[in-house]
UniProtKB/Swiss-Prot annotation:
Protein name: Nicotinate phosphoribosyltransferase
GO CC terms, sorted: cytosol
Tagged with keyword Phosphoprotein: yes
Domain of life: Bacteria
Gene designation: pncB
CDD domains xrefs: PncB_like (cd01401)
């Protein structure tokens, strides 16, 4: 296979906002914590043939660094501290932390090292894999086809919402990790900027260059790592929620609910957390059932749901977002994060269902037991059983 002509990535900020938000919290609170993370392809794609090309891109990433204009822009945001930004200025990717192999056609990737550094690999590395694969599989597809597909979707969207009050509909681009390419994501976001309901992007590079609001708080790994950082497994989720508020007392307050199922999350999400966090993010399971549980929980605590925001981000497209908006708009604030269905929705192109997830923290297992059993990730079945017991989970979920 011929090698990709040039580096896929051009900016250290070409990543999701929550990576930097979490990295700052790790820098301040868990500087010496060590982790391991692994790549998973949830589909049947045999991606091992791209291992050498991916390795070449990983090696090229060591040359990325925070540029002065990027540093100044980050310094103007309200939640970053000078000590972290000065450290980030000196940060360089370390390719030695990444092991890429072709295992009889299956792509294996394992990341190891200090959490404060490893945390940065996931999103850009997935974006690299996605762009490389689509470059070889669909060499004739690109920006024009992506924009044509988007225009068709926007025509349908306009018809679908003709009789709706859309003043409280807020859409965000969450499409970095599985985008067709960097150029396609930028073109899609620039087109969506023309719509009044488009409010921002999770991509820090695009947010800076297009003067958009960067969107994101924390990911599953924040909660997973606390399973080993916290001295008591049963209180690890509460420890993660409290540590986040310690770093961000009154900002970035959308909590992810499905690291250990929504029901287990709500048992930990008492009046103090529910009052201080601005809202919740859905990332697995039935979205309507999840939203109803969230609203009922706020009401039970005496909190007006209209003062809180629910963010839906699981496998969304525009029609699904409208359906959820119709259901919930009068009862709670809403935002919708759409990823693959915006940045890799091109006819004849099959998006990759790929993830990189934490599997160890300080040499011990961690797990994600989401509201969609197929999204469960953990090597250690005994740890999964211990986690289920600690959080009183009612059903067995297969560890994959």
């Amino acid at each position: 296979m011929t090698q990709f002509a040039s580096p896929v990535l051009h900016s250290l900020l070409d990543t999701d906002a929550y990576k930097l938000h979490m990295q700052q919290a790790v820098f301040h609170h868990y500087y010496d914590v060590q982790v391991a993370a692994e790549f998973r392809c949830r589909g049947d794609d045999l991606l091992g043939i791209y291992a050498d090309a991916i390795r070449e891109q990983v090696d090229a990433m060591q040359h990325l660094r925070l540029q002065e204009d990027e540093f100044q822009w980050l310094s103007g945001l309200p939640f970053f501290k000078p000590d972290y930004l000065n450290w980030l200025r000196e940060f360089r990717y370390n390719p030695a932390q990444v092991c890429v192999t072709n295992d009889n056609g299956k792509l294996n990737i394992r990341l190891t090292g200090p959490w404060r550094e490893v945390i940065m690999w996931e999103v850009p590395l997935l974006a690299v894999i996605s762009e490389l694969v689509h470059h070889y599989r669909s060499p004739n597809a690109g920006v024009d086809q992506a924009l044509d597909a988007l225009e068709s979707k926007l025509v349908d969207f306009t018809a679908l919402t003709a009789n709706l009050d859309m003043s409280r509909f807020h859409l965000m681009d969450f499409g970095t990790r599985r985008r067709f390419s960097r150029e396609v994501q930028q073109a899609i976001v620039k087109r969506l900027q023309q719509e009044s309901w488009f409010v921002g992007t999770s991509n820090y590079d695009l947010a800076r260059r297009l003067a958009l609001t960067p969107m994101g708080t924390q990911a599953h790994e924040w909660f997973q790592a606390h399973q080993q950082i916290s001295p008591d497994l049963a209180t690890s989720q509460r420890a993660a929620l409290a540590a986040w508020l310690n770093e961000y007392p009154d900002q970035l307050g959308i909590a992810l609910t499905d690291c250990i199922t929504m029901d287990a999350f709500l048992r930990d999400f008492g009046i103090e957390f529910a009052s201080r966090y601005q809202g919740l993010r859905h990332d697995s399971g039935d979205p309507v059932a999840w939203g109803e549980k969230a609203i009922a929980h706020y009401e039970k605590l005496g909190i007006d749901p209209l003062t809180k925001t629910l963010v839906f981000s699981d496998n969304l497209d525009l029609p699904k977002a409208v359906e959820l908006y119709r259901h919930f708009a009068s009862r709670v604030q809403l935002s919708f994060g759409i990823g693959t269905r915006l940045t890799c929705d091109i006819p004849q192109v099959k998006p990759l269902n790929i993830v990189i997830k934490l599997v160890e923290c300080n040499g011990k297992p961690v797990a994600k037991l989401s509201d969609s059993p197929g999204k469960t990730i953990c090597h250690d079945k005994a740890f999964v059983r211990a986690l289920r017991k600690a959080f009183d989970l009612p059903q067995v979920r297969k560890a994959s």
